[in-house]
Design a protein with these regions (language model features):
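Compact mixed alphabeta submodule
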Residues: 112, 116-184
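OB-fold ssDNA-binding interfaces and closely related basic DNA-contact patches used
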Residues: 1-100
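Structured, beta-strand-rich domain cores
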Residues: 63-144
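Residues in well-ordered beta-strands of folded domains
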Residues: 36-38, 102-104, 156-158
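Detector for Asparagine
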Residues: 2-3, 12, 19, 27, ...
Length: 184
């Protein structure tokens, strides 16, 4: 893989739709590990690296992207993985003021903590944590769809965050009621 197409995101990247422990099938497709990476618009260093990696993947994938007439469509005319949360998910507070990328892999990502220790406890890495992601970009041309996709390599949890999209914890839903006599 061309190193120009590999990026490690900044420390304020938030993980959402984290299907990192078990692969998930979408609409009958082959099961994949995946995560949505929410990157603050203020993280211009990471966003610049991603834009350069997308450009490098486009250049390297020109043969794959070529149309029947021999022409390569401009980058602006094909699908790219970097999307604007304010435009595409305006009602989702987690995506406000951020870009996002959906990264996928056929193989499980390595998952480590801030000290690079492997995380084995599934409850430690969930939708809502903050950390870094090692991702790569590549061109694709499948079933008439052309674009640049994002592959998921590894993940690093740096800090906890409010869980996203999951159900609440029972400890948060209930309080201890000592005065009630449920049997009497």
């Amino acid at each position: 893989m061309n190193n120009l197409m590999k990026v490690v995101t900044g420390a304020n990247t938030r993980m959402s739709y984290a299907n990192v422990w078990e692969p998930k099938s979408v609409n009958g497709s082959a099961p994949k590990y995946s995560v949505s990476l929410i990157i603050p618009k203020s993280d211009t260093v990471t966003l610049d690296k991603i834009k350069k990696a997308i450009q490098a993947a486009y250049k390297e994938g020109e043969v794959k992207l070529r149309c029947r007439d021999g022409k390569v469509p401009p980058l602006s005319a094909i699908r790219v993985p970097l999307r604007d949360g304010d435009l595409e998910k305006p009602d989702d507070e987690a995506y406000k003021g951020a870009f996002f990328i959906n990264a996928k892999s056929d193989t499980a990502p390595g998952i480590v903590d801030a000290q690079l220790n492997r995380i084995m406890d599934r409850s430690e890495f969930y939708s809502g944590v903050y950390g870094r992601a090692s991702i790569n970009f590549y061109a694709y041309n499948a079933n008439g769809n052309k674009g640049i996709a994002c592959g998921l390599n590894n993940l690093q949890k740096l800090r906890d965050g409010t869980p996203l999209g999951g159900k609440s914890r029972p400890e948060d839903d209930f309080s201890i009621e000592e005065d009630e006599d449920f049997l009497g």
